[in-house]
């Protein structure tokens, strides 16, 4: 089966968040199943600079943007073994340093950039005489593609659309509707119209042959008014075409047995290295040495409301006053940064805030902490809790989205639990869950057994398993396209 993955991100060359990692993990896993996989991404300026040997495949392919035309070039690059990637290049739209924005904020023409990217896919496939069996489009940046295919483009190809986060709707101002190249039927409420705007995400949801989101629980949550971002009615309408598939983990990157970023490797057969990692982390972060005999929580996150940062700010005083240490690595909204700095000043040696995106430090926190906090308001899939399980670092998570599918509370799943969960989105509920984890930590034998269960449970979160589920969806999409 020929599969074309279309994405705005692909690790390691164009990464802003989990989307890039997901595409880099899924592509080789599908290849291993026997699929002929290609990945198309925009030719961002900084990516082209990092890939000077990118092979020119075709150039000056005309892409209609309504009242005017633009051109696209196609270049081939291999960012990682088993990943055949193609960059859609246009200097005026993508020749910049940044995926969605730069230091001054998001690019104001992002909707135009990704309309062009989406419309270039059928044009470039036609120019290169390439006919995939399936296009796998991802999030609002590629949501126009299923609508174009429904209108008649690429009639021999099926479309599968992946919702990584329903909260990002990809608005197009009505005055730019001509760029889309769609008839008025597609611009109606039954199509991509959304409260006076046009939504590229809604276009993908409305017109793809099959839909996927990134966890079973999230697939149900987005059918509710609370978490459907105004699209819950459409999600319920298309529920029979929707599947929830957990993302996998790249165990070549995230493994305590081989991790080059941590001071001492370890495994379930020999856990001595985890204690050494904890001591090294406490020393590096300037934490109280007495915390070697107390639970230390870590958190690796972006500082946005989705991630439950207000719960952390509200609960940290109680957590550290109960004898725990807390290390938080992340960057984002300035209001959260100020509050976290204030807490670090109030609890020196007990609470450490590191304002940065620092992947090597993220690995060291994952290995050195006793538990990992994920108190998200919502979490479509989540990866850090899966990393934590792999490292024997017990997750304390709010039971939402992918967190509910991967973290099993030791009380609710007697004998099979791998962490601690809570339901209410409040500092008190988070603090109570942390208190339960802290009390369990004091029973060293029970904590050791829990770590072993956690590490064993991580083994199912593979891209190979996810790829098999995607392949099944592709087969169903191809059958649906032929009807």
From Swiss-Prot:
The record's GO molecular-function terms, alphabetically, read:
alpha-1,4-glucan glucosyltransferase (ADP-glucose donor) activity; alpha-1,4-glucan glucosyltransferase (UDP-glucose donor) activity
Question: Its catalytic activity?
Answer: [(1->4)-alpha-D-glucosyl](n) + ADP-alpha-D-glucose = [(1->4)-alpha-D-glucosyl](n+1) + ADP + H(+)
Segments traversing the membrane: none
The record ties this protein, via Gene3D superfamilies, to: Glycogen Phosphorylase B
Q: Which domain of life is it from?
A: Bacteria
InterPro entries from the xrefs? Glyco_trans_1, GS/SS, Starch_synth_cat_dom
Which CDD domains did the record assign? Answer: GT5_Glycogen_synthase_DULL1-like
Provide the residue positions that the database annotates as binding ADP-alpha-D-glucose: 15
| EC number(s) reported in the record | 2.4.1.21
Q: One GO biological process from the UniProt record?
A: glycogen biosynthetic process
> Which pathway does it serve?
Glycan biosynthesis; glycogen biosynthesis
Does the keyword Transferase feature in the UniProt annotation?
yes
- Which leading EC class covers this enzyme? transferase
Q: Which UniProt keywords apply?
A: Glycogen biosynthesis, Glycosyltransferase, Transferase
**Function as written in the Swiss-Prot or TrEMBL entry:** Synthesizes alpha-1,4-glucan chains using ADP-glucose.
The record's family statement is: Belongs to the glycosyltransferase 1 family. Bacterial/plant glycogen synthase subfamily.
**Name of the protein in question:** Glycogen synthase
Q: To which species is this protein native?
A: Desulfatibacillum aliphaticivorans
**Which gene specifies this protein's sequence?**
glgA
């Amino acid at each position: 089966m020929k599969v074309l993955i279309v994405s705005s991100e692909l690790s390691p060359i164009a990464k802003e968040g989990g989307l890039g990692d997901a595409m880099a993990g899924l592509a080789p896993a599908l290849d291993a199943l026997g699929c002929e996989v290609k990945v198309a991404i925009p030719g961002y300026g900084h990516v082209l600079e990092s890939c000077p040997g990118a092979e020119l495949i075709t150039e000056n392919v005309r892409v209609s943007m309504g009242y005017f035309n633009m051109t696209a070039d196609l270049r081939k690059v291999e960012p990682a073994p088993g990943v055949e990637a193609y960059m859609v290049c246009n200097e005026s739209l993508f020749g910049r340093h940044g995926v969605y924005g730069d230091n001054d904020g998001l690019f104001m023409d992002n909707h135009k950039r990704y309309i062009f990217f989406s419309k270039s896919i059928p044009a470039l496939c036609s120019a290169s005489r390439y006919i995939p069996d399936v296009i796998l489009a991802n999030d609002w940046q590629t949501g126009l593609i299923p609508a174009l295919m429904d209108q008649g483009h690429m009639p021999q190809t099926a479309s599968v659309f992946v919702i990584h986060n329903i909260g990002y709707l990809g608005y197009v101002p009505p005055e730019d509707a001509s760029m889309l190249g769609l008839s008025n039927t597609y611009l109606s409420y039954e199509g991509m119209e959304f409260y006076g705007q046009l939504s590229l995400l809604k276009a993908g949801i409305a017109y793809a042959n099959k839909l996927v989101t990134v966890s079973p629980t999230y697939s149900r949550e987005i059918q509710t008014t609370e978490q459907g971002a105004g699209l819950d009615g459409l999600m319920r309408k298309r529920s029979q075409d929707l599947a929830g598939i957990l993302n996998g983990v790249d165990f070549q990157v995230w493994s305590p047995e081989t991790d080059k970023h941590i001071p001492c490797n370890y495994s379930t057969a020999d856990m001595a290295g985890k204690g050494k990692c904890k001591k090294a982390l406490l020393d590096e972060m300037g934490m109280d040495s007495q915390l070697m005999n107390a639970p230390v929580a870590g958190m690796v996150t972006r500082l946005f409301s989705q991630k439950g940062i207000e719960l952390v700010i509200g609960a940290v005083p109680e957590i550290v006053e109960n004898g725990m240490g807390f290390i938080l690595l992340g960057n984002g909204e300035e209001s959260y940064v100020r509050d976290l700095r204030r807490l670090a000043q109030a609890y020196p040696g007990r609470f450490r805030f590191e304002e940065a995106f620092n992947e090597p430090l993220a690995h060291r926190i994952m290995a050195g902490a006793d538990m990992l906090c994920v108190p998200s308001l919502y979490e479509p899939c989540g990866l850090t809790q899966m990393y934590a399980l792999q490292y024997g670092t017990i997750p304390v998570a709010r039971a939402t989205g992918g967190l509910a599918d991967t973290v099993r509370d030791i009380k609710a799943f007697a004998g099979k639990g791998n962490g601690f969960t809570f339901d209410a989105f409040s500092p008190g509920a988070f603090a109570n869950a942390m208190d339960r984890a802290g009390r369990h930590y004091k029973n060293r034998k029970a904590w050791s057994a829990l770590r072993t269960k956690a590490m064993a449970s991580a083994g199912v979160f593979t891209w190979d398993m996810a790829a098999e589920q995607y392949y099944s969806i592709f087969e169903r999409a191809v059958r649906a396209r032929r009807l």
